[in-house]
């Protein structure tokens, strides 16, 4: 390897060199530097820990032709300087072999350079668990003394993304992402409870408090009550609300709605923007600068599809109200789909907040319940009907019966059939908004803040035998 090729090893240098090598009409280069640290435990003891590092480079070439602009995308992991030219040429060949891209737009320009673009990537390490790990060990001791077993994992990831384009963009974003999932089980495995947390640095995660919460829930489960399927007043905790609202956001395509394919389509044509979806003054929004839930302030698109476009790379992501005071305000669009539909440009953000409810905690909402069900979380959520956004899924790790303001026991699990849009319309109370980890979607979406919701007639369509 020559000194010239050996030099370009820092992510920003890799990006610059790839852009220099490009012979296409347009080029976008995305370098993702990822580091992770993790802990796993079972039966009140740590079992494994690890640290990983990785680099992925994505080159997007655009080629102008008589019939339009084509794009080619090639991504590779662990790319070295010597492999750059072959990667760039592969993207160019893919573009020349493709037809005109439907989503073609001029590459984004005019966005201010990130001042830290030339700095080395941020990294995580096992040091992120310096305070958390000893506290977890103390939780193991308490659980052991209390006759319960703790299982779970903690993962921390830090991704530094460098984005450069032939139109002059030089952008960078560092994204920390931490998740904790903790299960408590009785020694005979007949009772199980779960808690999860999303965090940027594990400094705000308290294993002792989580263990105490799970101990209470295992105590509730000592009394077992069988209930049939049916509609029940139900308290959905923030994690369950997050899973439902995230799926709703993923289904909020402006183009699909305009073309009559979704729950947000207006009968006879157009969209339901401006329609009241909830009598509660709820606001569903995304904001890349939301404290504690910060996310990329510009579009990072490694491929085109759905409501993202490689041509939009670097486009600023603005604070957006999807629902404002109960009214549908925006649907997700690219620049291309916005031009097709006449809707505003509204790229989807990587966080989601539902607020506008009361200041009552979930515990206070339980105390105000005559008879109803308290859920722990939802699992295995799948779409049944896009026209109504009817979803099906399972409850898991604890469904509790509340009578006269107190939990009186654990009931069986259920399969549910519900639409998140319908739930917003029927919810009678929203509690205090708090950061939460969506259990079903935690591999893809972790930055959420939600209230608990009270739904008077949640549809438990059948009984499930799972724990």
Task: Give the predicted meaning of each segment.
Residues 1-309, 324-325, 350, 406, ...:
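Active-site bordering "gate/hinge" segments
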Residues 269-467:
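Dual-mode signal for accessory low-complexity, basic/Gly-rich regions
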